[in-house]
Amino acid sequence: MASKERRYPEGKKLVSEQSDLNPTVSIIVPVKNGAATVQELLESLMQIDYDKNKLEVIVVDGNSTDDTQEIVSKFPVGLLKEERPGLNAARNTGINHSKGEIIAFTDCDCVVPRNWIKRLTEDFRNPQVGCVGGNILGYYDNFLSRYSDESILPVMRIFKKRKVLSSVKPPLQYPAGCNMAARREAIEDVGGYNENLMYGFDEDELVERICKKDYSMVLDPKVVVKHKHRLTLLELLKQNFQYGRGGGLLSKLEGTNSTFSRWILLCVSCFFLLCSAIAVLIFLIISAGSFISSVVLSAILLLPPIGLMVFYLRQTFNENNRGYKKVIVYPFIDIIRSIAFVSGAAYQLLRSVAKTEKVTQSGNSEI
């Protein structure tokens, strides 16, 4: 069992500037029951074009019950076991046992290109840069994977141009955990990942704290990994529901102190206001005395999906892509994804409130 105390190795030298243009890099891979995908990731990591004397790979296994550990042990990488639950406990354990000036993160369902680390380290040549994130593109060539990349709100991060920012900007201007890196001293400055966070928004919260320490953040579309997106609509909706739960938990823990928690609370509030407005419109349509009134009210109700259809029609036309199926289907998926996300956030917020009330009542009964 890894130590519960967050501690960095003694004698480790902190660097305010990298020693050369090729800093030492540690790649941290948290995994649990990843036997189906981890081998392909590790094979791609073995092909990385970077000085092997300055590169280490550390896989942190969270009590896998499949063949994950057996597969990982066949590769020349560090393998650690973490008994505490959660991605963040695994990530912190990997950080604690790493040596690199730059710490990169990816997941077991990703595949990285040979130039991944070179691209990442180039963005750290400015000592003010605390963290870097890049694009996560679909590994599979199927309809749902393409949707995940082409949606008006991509499932993963996709940046059109390189940006250097001083703060996170929801909903899209921040890195994702499967393709990001941070300077060691920046991670140490903020105390690592918050192990109380689960389900999602954990790396986002870390990046926000790093930026608040006056580090800058680089979003670079040339830093790319391939990700094995969800293969079914149900899996995608479950993923978005879990992301929403992560946002709800962050809002409970941080209140309005976090940019992300404020954004989540705004999303939940707007969602319920929209639902109320839709209910009123439906009532007015049903009770409308004239055909024209019903048509006008119905048109107002259909404005969001029609707007999305226009967006995807324009996207299809600009790309000279004849796949007009997406003009109809993508808006539908966008809407139910949004519902799943906000439902997850609302569920977690309500659950947290109920748990707090239960604890309070229990405490009062003991007085």
What are the residue ranges of the model-derived segments?
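Short, flexible, basic/aromatic active-site loop/helix in glycosyltransferases
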Residues: 134-135, 140, 151-172
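Conserved donor NDP-sugar-binding/catalytic core segment of glycosyltransferases
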Residues: 115-146, 228
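A conserved acidic beta->alpha catalytic loop
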Residues: 44, 61-69, 110
